[in-house]
Amino acid sequence: MNLREKYGEWGLILGATEGVGKAFCEKIAAGGMNVVMVGRREEKLNVLAGEIRETYGVETKVVRADFSQPGAAETVFAATEGLDMGFMSYVACLHSFGKIQDTPWEKHEAMINVNVVTFLKCFHHYMRIFAAQDRGAVINVSSMTGISSSPWNGQYGAGKAFILKMTEAVACECEGTGVDVEVITLGTTLTPSLLSNLPGGPQGEAVMKIALTPEECVDEAFEKLGKELSVIAGQRNKDSVHDWKANHTEDEYIRYMGSFYRD
């Protein structure tokens, strides 16, 4: 698909440095779009930007922003002003393991800013642009933790639930227009963060067998864009959600999700 012809000249990836964000950068560049890449680690972004320019022959723009800090969204808006924007994906996330009372408020506030406030500011801003021009696309990234809840990782799951439900609603509102909106919900994904914390032995091998690559997740997201409002990445994840909803109570599902994070 020529994404540039369909949606516009520039795409914006929020949380672009590695993993799923990097895969989104490569995907839209392969579709002919120039890429605005936003993240905290400017040096890594510059390396990725150079690779994308060389491989795909598109323009890139690197923006350093910490989504946990006030003003981060406004930094992004200023960097994209005047560009022909046609795509946005919010990939960034922040989590902290532990009980609500054991997590410092400052950490809670940072997670709210990343997972809710900056997300919504960016979604609102670029949806206004896309709606006004009746052209554009959004793919936001949620998590299986947002489908049920995520004990001992509670605020992360709640934030992902917000992204999931907010994007689903907007996707429905956009049906029949020139703007395509979708949320993709990810399960275990082979990101650098996962690989660096992967346990050894049979447990690690089991994770590797079920995990999807970032590229597989992004490919499925684009395959379903404009066709489905809400996508669960991978057949195994789809089957798992269907099984738990059909054959278990909500309490059982909550306790099951908590078993992944409880000490």
Curated annotation (Swiss-Prot):
Listed GO biological process terms = bile acid catabolic process; lipid catabolic process
Give the binding site residues for NADP(+).
17-21, 40-41, 66-67, 240
Temperature note: Is not very thermostable. The enzyme is completely inactivated at 50 degrees Celsius within 5 minutes and at 40 degrees Celsius within 400 minutes.
pH dependency: Optimum pH is 9-10 for the oxidation of ursodeoxycholate. Optimum pH is 4-6 for the reduction of 7-oxo-LCA and dehydrocholate.
Which UniProt keywords are given for this protein, alphabetically ordered? Bile acid catabolism, Lipid degradation, Lipid metabolism, NADP, Nucleotide-binding, Oxidoreductase, Steroid metabolism
Protein origin, superkingdom: Bacteria
Site location (Lowers pKa of active site Tyr): 160
Recount the UniProt induction comment for this entry: Is expressed constitutively and repressed by ursodeoxycholate.
Domains: entry comment: The 27 C-terminal residues (residues 237-263) are absolutely required for enzymatic activity; a deletion mutant lacking this C-terminal region shows a complete absence of enzymatic activity.
Q: What is this protein called?
A: 7beta-hydroxysteroid dehydrogenase
Organism lineage string: Bacteria, Bacillati, Actinomycetota, Coriobacteriia, Coriobacteriales
